[in-house]
Regions:
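N-terminal targeting and processing segments
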Residues: 76-77, 98-101, 133
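Extended charged/polar low-complexity repeat regions
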Residues: 92-94, 109-351
Length: 351
């Protein structure tokens, strides 16, 4: 380029803050590539604020991680940076991202992988069984539909370890950034068809993260809701050790009703909470459209190693403001371990 250091969106700076401005699109399959940096050779300071776009960023915080093979790890990251084409708000509220916030868009002219860092990575269309490698992102994308990769292929052993139903399905896509794995399995969530739907229903023009698979063939599965207000949202996880987790999700209307009921029964409240103070729906913000669905708690429902010793309380619990912003995090002892404050004039902007 110009002899200056290059970086792309999502890379970490010297002082620990990730770059959140710059090109979020990388074309894979083109004869040449372009690397963008926020400010080649420039000075940066301030933690956790990125001084260039003025965005506050928090690196990943892990709320849940039990030991074992291919465990379910629940973490979250925050950035106040708002893109011009934001993805829908996730289950932690505006500005927050979870590891499962990954989607692959299927278009006539190509594939777009939206990762959990807000980037859009472009690939050429793939035939069944075809694989492509992004040198700039160090990432493989492979379409299912092939029993084995050619001998000597970088992914031959990792591909062969996948269960046959995953390897042979041309409707599944898999991504990985290492020949050692794991795979991100990109499929679609089942849903209950409506009375007006034509059957069989066509597959959606996108794929969502439905699970992980490691080089030993073990899988982690995300279960998504098939009907109702939570359609498409993750409500259950089974990890590589066979443990089953239940993710309790709430809607904005449910949280508003609970808050109003609590205010009526509280001796500290002189008047009931009004609908305007805690609305039943959330307007769209600069962070994207918002269905108002939030993760409330995570329960361990089954553990093959300790079937009779399940915890009587959730492993982690979350509370939210009336604007749907993540307010506090509580551990399994119901101790508050994190709390957050936001700008009242700008929903989702942490202060």
């Amino acid at each position: 380029m110009s002899g200056k250091p290059a970086a792309r969106q999502g890379d970490m700076t010297q002082y620990g803050g990730p770059i959140v401005q710059g090109s979020a699109g990388v074309r894979i399959g083109a004869p040449t590539g372009v690397a963008c940096s926020v400010c080649p050779g420039g000075m940066t300071s301030g933690n956790p604020v990125n001084p260039l776009p003025g965005a506050k960023v928090l690196p990943g915080e892990t709320d849940l991680a039990l030991p074992g093979p291919l465990p379910f790890i629940l973490s979250r990251t925050y950035s106040s940076y708002r893109t011009k084409t934001p993805a829908p708000v996730g289950v932690f509220g505006p500005g927050w991202k979870a590891p499962s916030d990954i989607r692959l868009q299927l278009r006539d002219d190509g594939l777009i992988l939206n990762d959990n860092g807000g980037r859009s990575i472009h690939f050429e269309p793939l035939l069944p069984g075809e694989a492509v490698y992004s040198r700039s992102e160090s990432m493989w994308l492979v379409r299912g539909g092939k029993a084995a990769q050619p001998d000597g292929h970088t992914l031959a052993r990792l591909w062969g370890a996948l269960p046959p139903d995953i390897r042979l399905s041309p409707h599944l896509y898999l991504a990985t950034n290492s020949a050692q794995g794991p795979w991100w399995i990109l499929g679609w969530s089942e849903r209950v068809p409506g009375a007006e739907d034509v059957l069989p229903a066509p597959l959606p023009p996108y794929r969502e993260l439905t699970g992980l698979a490691d080089r030993f063939g073990r899988t982690l599965t995300y279960r998504r809701e098939a009907a109702g207000d939570l359609t498409g949202e993750i409500t259950g996880v089974t990890d590589g050790a066979g443990r089953e987790f239940r993710l309790v999700l709430t809607t904005q209307a449910q949280r508003a009703e609970e808050a109003r009921t609590s205010s009526l029964s509280s001796s500290d409240s002189s008047r009931p909470l009004s609908a305007s103070a805690f609305p039943d729906t959330l307007p769209g913000t600069e962070y994207g459209p918002d269905r108002g669905i939030r993760l409330s708690a995570v329960w361990l429902m089954h553990d093959p190693a300790y079937p009779e010793s399940l915890p009587a309380a959730p492993l982690v619990r979350y509370t939210y403001t009336e604007a749907g912003e993540l307010l506090a995090v509580y551990d399994r002892s119901n101790t508050q371990v994190r709390a957050f404050t936001y700008d009242a004039q700008h929903p989702g902007r942490m202060v």
